[in-house]
Amino acid sequence: MDNKKIRNFAIIAHIDHGKSTLADRILEFTNTVSKRDLKEQHLDSMDLEKERGITIKLNAVQIRYNSYIFHLIDTPGHVDFTYEVSRSLAATEGALLLVDASQGIQAQTLANVYLALENNLEIIPIINKIDLPSANVDKVKAEIENTIGISAENAILISAKNGIGIEKVLEAIVNLIPPPQASDEKDPLKALVFDSYFDIYRGVIIFIRVVTGKISVGDTFKFMANNLKFSVIELGISSPNQVKKEALFAGEVGWVAASIRNAKDVEVGDTITLVENPAKSPLPGYKKLVPVMYTGFYPVDSQQYNLLKDSLEKISLSDSSIIYEPESSKALGFGFRIGFLGLLHMEILQERLEREFNLSIIATAPSVEFQITRTNGQVQIISNPSLFPEPNFISEIREPYILAKIFLPEEFLGQIMGLCQDKRGIYVDLEYIDDFRRRLIYKLPLVEVIFDFFDRLKSLSKGYASFEYEVIDYQVSKLQKLDILLNGQKIDALSMIVHKDFAYPKARDLTQKLKEIIPRHSFEVPVQAVIGSKVIARETIKAYRKDVTAKLYGGDVTRRKKLLEKQKAGKKRMKSFGVVDVPQEAFLAILKTNVSEK
């Protein structure tokens, strides 16, 4: 196959800027998928992706256009899924930068463009939704030039929804994106693993981009990170359905089935090479994924623990970023502590478990990894608040900080700066992008961002602000563990880590919420928030009482007193042994205590 006829590219866009729609139009225009078979968001395979209008898993598809072969790698646009983007960009030579004509450049678009520039990709600016009344093409062109520093003079103007300008996009791919580097078939094989999924009949299917050499059916290859060896049983391309081939050559993107039974054997971003003629070094530039937040997942029905375990195993086959380990809680029984890339990532996993495996899940409040130095000098890394040592054994606590870059219209600057201050933010910089838009840079504690920062940012800015972040370092903070006691019993799953300055308002808010949520019992239930052994907030859930005197009529008053005393003694005994029923909403209440920490 002639290398000069291949073009590998990805589409970079913020959520809702029309990326999946553009991919649909390209598939339709090139007859890769017939109009009859084309579904909206064709490359988004999960129902969840279509419902939320977002791309979660990346997809690779081969497209024929005239005498050329394109490999389009569809990428996610949300900040939580940056790892998916970085992994797909490394498999391409060019990127289509898709910008909404009415909204302009957003934070996540910029983050992904920088990833593309780091990979030395050719970037083609495309302005979408030009048919909208609010479209401002000249302003967006100026933004692209000022913010990113690439020429937007020849930016392609399209409407993906109405199919306007699609042919110009295809011609630009041919003329502007360079072909893959030429390579001799006899060169050692180097192929980048950029995705994988699990097939119940064929095991783990890996998606690869062949950089040098070739790979054929029957070849034995090894992963360079762990040296595990496998033989190729089938390989081929996606068009967008799988088509089998005998070999994949340099520049091609395709899939390989090799009876890989354990998903943990496949590390996305690894390099594969042939055992007989191995490459000396792997391809550069891949990082191991590190979760930024941790949450406990527990089945509502404790008998579904094994089903939850199997379900997590199956999902982790296609989502290599999920890290989990078993844990137990006195209140909730057996479950798992799971590491995520962000709050959206967590919500999506919970929805997938509930939909695909019919599980009912209780999720505890998300937390981050804290570095705790004990008084004896020992350093511990703890992500579960219930495992924190007692305050008198702690010498210092360090928490992760992020560098947040927030894009926003000038009119919302005051409110967003106020939000960052509420979240213990440290001001770094303010940049003027144009007459109307600003880029605000803050250092923020990660634990403050994972709760409701994104939602509040959107509501304060009427949806116009966007942000991206990176974890930068750990800093010493005045943090304390806040425990909740119900009827004198500590509920470990309700424990949380709070800043000393916000402990009292947060404790008061949480006890009031729990008082409203937890149903009344036959006995009085005190709800206490404690730090160490000190109670800092308390509410009482009043008991409901049975009218034991209802059957009395007339007679001596001592009879009435005797019945009431008997009821009182019974309630006292019940209070000692009674179990408080804690509904799922109580755990969600923790997420909602971040309303404002002023």
UniProtKB/Swiss-Prot annotation:
UniProt cross-references to InterPro entries, sorted A to Z: EF-4, EFG_III/V, EFG_V-like, EFTu-like_2, G_TR_CS, LepA_C_sf, LepA_CTD, LepA_IV
Primary location: membrane
Binding site for GTP: 16-21, 128-131
GO biological process, one term: positive regulation of translation
Superkingdom, natural source: Bacteria
One matching Pfam family: GTP_EFTU_D2
Cellular component, GO, one term: plasma membrane
EC number: 3.6.5.n1
Domain tr-type G: 4-181
Topological category with respect to the lipid bilayer: Peripheral membrane protein
Catalytic activity: GTP + H2O = GDP + phosphate + H(+)
Localization: Cell membrane
Keyword S-adenosyl-L-methionine annotated: no
One GO molecular-function entry: GTPase activity
Keyword vocabulary terms for this entry: Cell membrane, GTP-binding, Hydrolase, Membrane, Nucleotide-binding, Protein biosynthesis
HAMAP family the record matches: LepA
NCBIfam families: lepA, small_GTP
Family assignment from sequence similarity: Belongs to the TRAFAC class translation factor GTPase superfamily. Classic translation factor GTPase family. LepA subfamily.
Biological function: Required for accurate and efficient protein synthesis under certain stress conditions. May act as a fidelity factor of the translation reaction, by catalyzing a one-codon backward translocation of tRNAs on improperly translocated ribosomes. Back-translocation proceeds from a post-translocation (POST) complex to a pre-translocation (PRE) complex, thus giving elongation factor G a second chance to translocate the tRNAs correctly. Binds to ribosomes in a GTP-dependent manner.
Name the record gives this protein: Elongation factor 4
Organism: Mesomycoplasma hyopneumoniae (strain J / ATCC 25934 / NCTC 10110) (Mycoplasma hyopneumoniae)
Gene: lepA
